Swiss-Prot record:
PANTHER family: UPF0260 PROTEIN YCGN (PTHR37421:SF1). Coiled coil: none annotated. This is UPF0260 protein CJA_2436. It holds the Pfam family CxxCxxCC.
């Protein structure tokens, strides 16, 4: 029997169907965190302040279909935009696949379990606060290193 390569190893992001591309999202919620960028160095710092539409337990957007209309700065990833979205976490499957790297064992496509990202402690579940509970001028006080 010949082993068949999984789609994320056999295709580029551009070759994937929309459903395949969407399934790469592990549901970590890290892209929904407020980030700060050092203007001098370009370094990106994640905070534990999440978008008001992020479900803090499931780490999914509660308004996914309307997210861009509701949050102007919400980035909608496409196969062509991944490479330029430099702030994606190093564990992000979109980034890994674009770089030709394997997915982590805890990724739901590998584990077969949609909760494995949470079980492995790789999601923001239980680690974030909602943006409407903090003063956004104080985001520097919320910088975290666990991303």
């Amino acid at each position: 029997m010949v082993a068949q390569r999984v789609f994320w190893a056999a295709k580029t992001l551009q070759e994937m169907s929309p459903d395949e591309f969407e399934s790469l999202c592990d549901g970590c919620g890290k892209c929904c965190l407020h980030k700060l960028e050092d203007e001098d160095t370009g370094d990106v710092y994640y905070t534990n302040v999440a978008c008001r539409h992020l479900d803090h337990d499931r780490c999914r957007c509660t308004r996914y279909d309307q997210r861009q209309q509701l949050v102007a700065e919400c980035v909608v990833l496409t196969p062509d935009s991944v490479r330029d979205t430099y702030w994606l976490p190093e564990t992000c499957a979109y980034r890994l696949v674009d770089q030709g790297l394997p997915l982590f064992d805890w990724h739901p496509l590998i584990s077969g379990d949609p909760d494995s990202v949470h079980t492995a402690g790789m999601s923001v579940a239980g680690k974030v606060v909602a943006e409407n509970t903090v003063a956004l001028d104080d985001l520097e006080d919320y910088i975290v290193r666990w991303v």
